[in-house]
Regions:
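Hydrophobic h-region of N-terminal signal peptides that target proteins for export
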Residues: 7-17
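Short N-terminal segments immediately surrounding and downstream of signal-peptide cleavage
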Residues: 18-36, 147
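Short acidic amphipathic segments
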Residues: 38-54, 59-62
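Short amphipathic alpha-helices in soluble, non-transmembrane regions
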Residues: 38-41, 72-82
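Structural detector for short beta-strands of small beta-barrel domains
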Residues: 88-102, 132-134
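OB-fold (S1/OB) nucleic-acid-binding surfaces
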Residues: 99-117
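Short nucleic-acid-contacting surface segments enriched for D/E, G, S/T with interspersed K/R
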Residues: 121-133
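OB-fold/S1-family single-stranded nucleic acid-binding modules
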Residues: 139-150
Length: 150
């Protein structure tokens, strides 16, 4: 189960929505050159403005262009290419509030394969664009990223 804990603000702009920043924690590093090349490999992804790795803390920090098509899964998969385990991610994302087929609140992010489920007692305005920052605690493949607002 993926759990995202987020603070959010509603903004007046629309027109684009995507992940803006990702800090992904990893563990199980068996290949020092793999970790050292992680930032370089990340920079090859179109839409990445900067990438840095703190090997001692096991954190890859990725800053994305304002308008990009980068998905959280892309960064997770890049880290896991060499057997390293992606553990959690702190993300900053902008998206549009919607409802899924069951009526649950979700955050739609264009080009993002997985919607974010908004888990909160808060009532949302359909179609509102929100900025959120939160934590994905479980990065296993799943049909839905879970988003719990504080």
């Amino acid at each position: 189960m993926r759990l995202l804990l987020f603070a959010f603000t509603v903004t007046a702009f629309a027109g684009f929505a995507q992940v803006q920043r990702i800090e992904m924690t990893f563990e199980g590093v068996n290949c020092v050159p793999c970790v050292e090349s992680m930032a370089t490999r990340t920079m090859r992804i179109r839409g990445v403005e900067s990438a840095s790795v703190d090997g001692a803390k096991g954190v890859l920090t990725v800053q994305l262009a304002r308008q990009n098509r980068v998905r959280v899964e892309q960064i997770r998969d890049l880290i896991q290419q060499d057997g390293t385990k992606a553990v959690r991610a702190v993300v900053e994302v902008t998206g549009t509030v919607a409802r899924d087929e069951t009526g649950a609140w979700i955050l739609r992010i264009p080009k993002q394969a997985l919607p974010l489920e908004l888990k909160s007692s808060t009532t949302y305005e359909l179609g509102a664009t929100v900025n959120v920052r939160g934590v994905i605690e479980d990065l296993k493949r799943s049909p839905l990223l879970r988003l719990a607002l504080r």
